[in-house]
């Protein structure tokens, strides 16, 4: 019965998540749809600890990608621009080609101003061009460190709801970073997603600040829980030691310990 109810809850949550994702797909915001789908998938895995859901999600994502390719013309354009930007450099591939030119030149020699929407979804190309590849790699390490910190905070949570919130926010942040940097490096098709706390945009920066604020609050909660646990363990040990010491003293007062010692000596003789 418990397994049946658990599977029923998974189905209900899957339907609600699918409705939300389909609304984003209908508004042609496929980048956000992918982010929220990955958030739901990993939260489902953490809550159920069933790896089958990850494989089912990967299969569903592959099927949805094929369907989106045939339904939306802009998805086809971005796929062609990702596969061979030089063949469509005058149209859909212009942004990707200019991004590669900027990063390939580097250190003030490129021209990031020629990249369309360079301050948003292709901000990583401008950073790599202006500050060099080393600075770009350091930026990636900073983003990766933030994700690891999110996972560490999630592991410190005793409450499952708090843990799921940490996992969801951490996965959303990581996927957003991967989509932005991966699109600029031509690893994946461009999705139009901004780089958290780096790209321009008031709503993007504000939402990311809310994410970090929530994570900071959950980190404080996790630290308090950890301190309470570490304090409780030695206290229990001290109480047991005190009780044993008091019991020994009582036996010494009544002479029980001495009698036991004398009996043992007689047996030895």
Model-derived segments and spans:
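Transmembrane alpha-helix interface/packing and boundary motifs in multi-pass membrane proteins
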Residues: 20-27, 105-110, 128-129, 179, ...
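Interfacial segments of multi-pass membrane proteins
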Residues: 39-53, 115-135, 192-206
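A juxtamembrane structural motif centered on a specific transmembrane helix
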Residues: 181-188, 193-269
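Hydrophobic, glycine- and aromatic-enriched re-entrant/interface helices and adjoining loop segments
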Residues: 53-139, 158-165
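Structural signal for the C-terminal ends of transmembrane alpha-helices
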Residues: 1-4, 41-50, 68, 141-157, ...
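Loop-to-helix entry and N-terminal half of a specific, functionally important transmembrane alpha helix
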Residues: 156-192, 198
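Hydrophobic alpha-helical segments of polytopic membrane proteins
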Residues: 5-26, 30-70
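Alpha-helical transmembrane segments of multi-pass membrane proteins
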Residues: 24, 65, 69, 142, ...
């Amino acid at each position: 019965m418990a397994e049946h109810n658990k599977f029923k809850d998974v189905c209900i949550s899957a339907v609600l998540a699918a409705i939300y994702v389909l609304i984003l797909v209908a508004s042609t915001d496929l980048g956000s749809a992918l982010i929220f789908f990955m958030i739901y998938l990993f939260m489902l895995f953490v809550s159920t600890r069933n790896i089958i859901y990850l494989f089912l999600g990967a299969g569903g994502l592959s099927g949805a990608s094929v369907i989106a390719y045939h339904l939306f013309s802009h998805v086809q354009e971005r796929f062609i621009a990702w596969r061979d930007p030089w063949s469509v450099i005058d149209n859909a591939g212009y942004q990707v080609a200019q991004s590669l030119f900027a990063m390939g030149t580097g250190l003030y020699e490129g021209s990031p101003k020629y990249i369309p929407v360079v301050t948003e979804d292709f901000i990583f190309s401008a950073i790599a061009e202006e500050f060099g590849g080393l600075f770009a790699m350091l930026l990636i390490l900073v983003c990766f460190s933030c994700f690891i910190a999110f996972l560490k905070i999630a592991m410190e949570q005793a409450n499952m709801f708090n843990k799921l919130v940490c996992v969801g926010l951490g996965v959303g942040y990581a996927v957003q970073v991967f989509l932005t940097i991966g699109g600029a490096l031509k690893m994946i098709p461009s999705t139009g997603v901004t780089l958290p706390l780096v790209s321009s945009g008031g709503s993007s920066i504000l939402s990311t600040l809310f994410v970090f604020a929530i994570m900071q609050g959950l980190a404080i909660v996790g630290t308090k829980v950890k301190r309470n646990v570490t304090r409780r363990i030695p206290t229990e040990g001290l109480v047991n030691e005190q009780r044993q010491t008091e019991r020994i003293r009582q036996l010494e007062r009544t002479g029980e310990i001495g009698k036991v010692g004398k009996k043992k000596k007689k047996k030895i003789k």
